[in-house]
Every structure is written in structure tokens, then in C-alpha cells.
């Protein structure tokens, strides 16, 4: 869930631990001094001062290191909240596409906040914690919008006599640890209890962990979730801001970890076929059009679903009748020429005029060829379909391909476990 760039600072209660960096109004996360010590090139991203890349490694080197080893990413700009109350599941179901009632405790799911017309307000991860709350993470670029949305809906919910309270986690940073060596590195640097937790934590599962790298706070513990935005095995650690800087520094002492910036994070997520809100997802797109029908829980697909799914009339109609979907999100792959940039028009030999548009694109470091995500008319979405992308007033051949471009390596819970 890499949030689209916004040129102004987000000034919200949930980021109260962040301080001003300079006259531009950018905000610092608790890892700011770590970034500077590692020679980061900082940019303003969604109003935050964040690293685009680090000294001694170019973007491709950073990308490949995550695919082969372990990289850490500062994602503290994202919006972290807890939903408390006896009716917390009903509250979040009333805002999203997910079936939380049937989601096992200790696990999470990707989801989308929905508008009344079925459009996507934001994408998010909802964790149904063993503790009496939901832990939710969504995008920084949408933080102000979603904060206001949650506050308004909480008031409406309370007036209806139901019990749900939104807690904005302004005192927590968020560190993503990604790559095939992530598990080993974390396991070697926790307590016996922590090792037992990690040994029984699989993809999209979440738990409190008492200690990492010798750091702990029993009154304000860290939460670790086995998930990420790269397609690799990995974790996201929600850490009290007072421990964040030392956690990053101690991870670097292992000599097995490298810090990774936003540029490589974007190429990693694109290879993994993951959406970027503001590019691949928006308020004008439904989950079905975004090829995310699987986010609509089976129970929520019933007209009698309680609560009803937001925008259900349109979404359920699209699920039942493919003719209701005029365009869909797809993956396309090309050669080694210029990159397909967002907004580039897509053409076909079969009809005159554009058939779609690129929403994200890059030269894949893993594949050595251009890949992109795009929205095209439904009749042009079959894998193997030959298309052309207009780049600098020239047409370059691309082929519709299945997503993800690079197979993911998530460690899923065995079915018999």
C-alpha cells in the first residue's frame, strides 16, 4: 500500500510524535536520524521526509538485495489505528468489503474502504487480534480523508446504539522487514518466547511480541505482522516511537540488513502485482474493476448481508454479470525499451482508438523487461492479448500477462496446522 505522493504535509492528531524538518513543512518520522546516518537521499513524500534511496546502493541493488536477503523500510507515514468495542467487527464491515465475522482471531486480511457508489476510498489491512481490538493499517496519502471518515462513521455508529471506538496510534512507528532472510534475522534476535511466537506466525497473522533485539516495553509492547508490500516473506513491526530509532540501529549491527528507500519499494510492489492507491486504485474504481473481487467476502456477497456492503448494489451486480464491467486492471509486459508511465495510452490492432491506459510501470530489475499495470476494456484482458503502449509518440508492443509478474514467496500456514 504505497501511498501516492502529496506535496503538502498531513497535519493530524495521529502523527503527534512527528516533528517539523524544515521550512517546507515536511514531517519527520522517529527513524529520521537513522536515515541521515545511513546517507539517505530524503524527499517529501505525502508530507513526510522519507528516503528515496541510500548511499552506497543504487535502486536496482536495493531491489535485488530485498529479493535475496533482507531490507528494512520506514513506513511510519502510514495510518495505524485500533478499533475497540463490542461491535468493532460490525463497524468495520459497514465500511469495507471484508467478512470479519468469519476471519480467525490472530489473522488479517487485505481490504478496501468503500464509497456508497462502490468506489474505493483506500486499501487497508485489517488484523483481527487476539486482544479485544482490530489493528488496521492504511495509506498515508489518504490519512486525512480516512481519519475524517472514521470519526464521522463512529459518531453515526454510536448514535445507532452500537459500541465501537477508533484509537489513532500516534505513538507508534512502523518498520517493514522484508526478504527471505527476515525470519532468521528476527528469530536470532528475540527471546525464547519471541522465537515461539515467530515459529507459529504465518502470512497475514499478527501477534504482540515481547522483545526484539533486546528492546521491550511491557506496558507498550511491539506488534509484529507477517506481511508486506514486496511479494517476499517479511514482517511489519509496529513499535513505540521511543524504541524505534534504537531498533533500526540494532538491526543494522547484524551486518545482514540494508535500509531500502521508496524507489525500490515501488519496483518491488509492482513486480508483486500490488496496487498503488492514487494510480491503480481510486474512488472511481470498484473492487471488481480493480481485479480485486476476492476482497469481497463470500458472506458479504449476499443481498441480505448485515451490514450491507457499501456500494453493494453496483458491486454485487458486477460480480453476477461480467457485462456490467467495462474495464479491468491487468498486467502487461513488454521489452527493454522505454518504460510505460502512468497515463500512457494503450492500443490494439483490433479496433481504432485507445483501449486503455497505464496506471503503474517500471523496468523490472528481476525480469529485465518492462512491466506495467493498466486498465483496459474487458474484451482485451485475456492473457496473451497483444497490445501497444504509446510512449513518446511511438507504439511499443506489450502482452497481457497474469499477475504477479514475479511469484510471491509468502510463508502460509500449512492447511493441517
Labelled PLM ranges:
Residues 2, 12-114, 119-121:
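Acidic, proline/glycine-enriched N-terminal capping motif
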Residues 98-153:
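Well-ordered mid-protein domain cores that form the structural environment of catalytic cofactors
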Amino acid at each position: 500500500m504505497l501511498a501516492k505522493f502529496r506535496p503538502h504535509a498531513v497535519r493530524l492528531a495521529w502523527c503527534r510524535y512527528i516533528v517539523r524538518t524544515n521550512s517546507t513543512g515536511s514531517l519527520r518520522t522517529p527513524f529520521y536520524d537513522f536515515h541521515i546516518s545511513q546517507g539517505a537521499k530524503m524527499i517529501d513524500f505525502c508530507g513526510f521526509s522519507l528516503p528515496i534511496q541510500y548511499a552506497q546502493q543504487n535502486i536496482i541493488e536495493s531491489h535485488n538485495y530485498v529479493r535475496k536477503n533482507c531490507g528494512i523500510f520506514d513506513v511510519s507515514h502510514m495510518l495505524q489505528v485500533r478499533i475497540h468495542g463490542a461491535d468493532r467487527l460490525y463497524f468495520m464491515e459497514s465500511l469495507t468489503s471484508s467478512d470479519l465475522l468469519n476471519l480467525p482471531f490472530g489473522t488479517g486480511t487485505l481490504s478496501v474502504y468503500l464509497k456508497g457508489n462502490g468506489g474505493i476510498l483506500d486499501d487497508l489491512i485489517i488484523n483481527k487480534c487476539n486482544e479485544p481490538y482490530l489493528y488496521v493499517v492504511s495509506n498515508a496519502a489518504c490519512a486525512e480523508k480516512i481519519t475524517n471518515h472514521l470519526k464521522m462513521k463512529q459518531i453515526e455508529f454510536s448514535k445507532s446504539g452500537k459500541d465501537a471506538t477508533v484509537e489513532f496510534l500516534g505513538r507508534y512507528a512502523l518498520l517493514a522487514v522484508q526478504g527471505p532472510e527476515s525470519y532468521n534475522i528476527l528469530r536470532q534476535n528475540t527471546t525464547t518466547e519471541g522465537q515461539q511466537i515467530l515459529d507459529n506466525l504465518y502470512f497475514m497473522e499478527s501477534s504482540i511480541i515481547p522483545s526484539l533485539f533486546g528492546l521491550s516495553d511491557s506496558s507498550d509492547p511491539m506488534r509484529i505482522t507477517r506481511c508486506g508490500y514486496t511479494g517476499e516473506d517479511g514482517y511489519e513491526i509496529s513499535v513505540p516511537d521511543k524504541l524505534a530509532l534504537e531498533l533500526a540501529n540494532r538491526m543494522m549491527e547484524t551486518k545482514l540488513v540494508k535500509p531500502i528507500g521508496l524507489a525500490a519499494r515501488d519496483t518491488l510492489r509492482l513486480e508483486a502485482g500490488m496496487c498503488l492507491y492514487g494510480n491503480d486504485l481510486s474512488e472511481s474504481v470498484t473492487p471488481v474493476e480493480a481485479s480485486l473481487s476476492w476482497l469481497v467476502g463470500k458472506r458479504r456477497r449476499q443481498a441480505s448481508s448485515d451490514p450491507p456492503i457499501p456500494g453493494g448494489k453496483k458491486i454485487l451486480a458486477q460480480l453476477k454479470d461480467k457485462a456490467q464491467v467495462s474495464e479491468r486492471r491487468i498486467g502487461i509486459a513488454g521489452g527493454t525499451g522505454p518504460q510505460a508511465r502512468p497515463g500512457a495510452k494503450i492500443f490494439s490492432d483490433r479496433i481504432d482508438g485507445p483501449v486503455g491506459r497505464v496506471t503503474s510501470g517500471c523496468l523490472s530489475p528481476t525480469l529485465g523487461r518492462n512491466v506495467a499495470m493498466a486498465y483496459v476494456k474487458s474484451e482485451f484482458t485475456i492473457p496473451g492479448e497483444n497490445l501497444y503502449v504509446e510512449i513518446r509518440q511511438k507504439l511499443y508492443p506489450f502482452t497481457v500477462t497474469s499477475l504477479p509478474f514475479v511469484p510471491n514467496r509468502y510463508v502460509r500456514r500449512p492447511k493441517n496446522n
